[in-house]
Amino acid sequence: MSRVCELTGKGVQTGNNVSHANNKTKRRFLPNLCQVTLISDALGQRFRLRVSAAALRSVEHRGGLDAFLLKSGENELSMRARLLRRQIAKKTAEAA
């Protein structure tokens, strides 16, 4: 299981621990990933995704999973999220 957010693509970054004496040692900055269940209003289903805490805040800010996926670009989404985005777009186009 990779340490990458399924919605934003946020992943592991590298950097240095810097001591008081300015000694530098390599370290990794891990994203704050959570297993969450998000509900799609258009599809009427629940989806379990591994997302970062920042992405979860963005989903709530944009008004839910459907709105977040439709507003986001496909290049930053995981394959599973891209499939969801296409299904939601198709369902909303049928309803309109």
Swiss-Prot record:
Gene giving rise to this polypeptide: rpmB
Assigned keywords, A-Z: Ribonucleoprotein, Ribosomal protein
One term of GO molecular function: structural constituent of ribosome
HAMAP family: Ribosomal_bL28
Protein name per its UniProtKB record: Large ribosomal subunit protein bL28
GO-annotated biological processes: translation
One Pfam family here: Ribosomal_L28
KW Ribonucleoprotein (keyword) present: yes
GO CC annotation: cytosolic large ribosomal subunit
Biological source species: Agrobacterium fabrum (strain C58 / ATCC 33970)
Family classification: Belongs to the bacterial ribosomal protein bL28 family.
Top-level taxon: Bacteria
PANTHER family: 39S RIBOSOMAL PROTEIN L28, MITOCHONDRIAL, LARGE RIBOSOMAL SUBUNIT PROTEIN BL28M
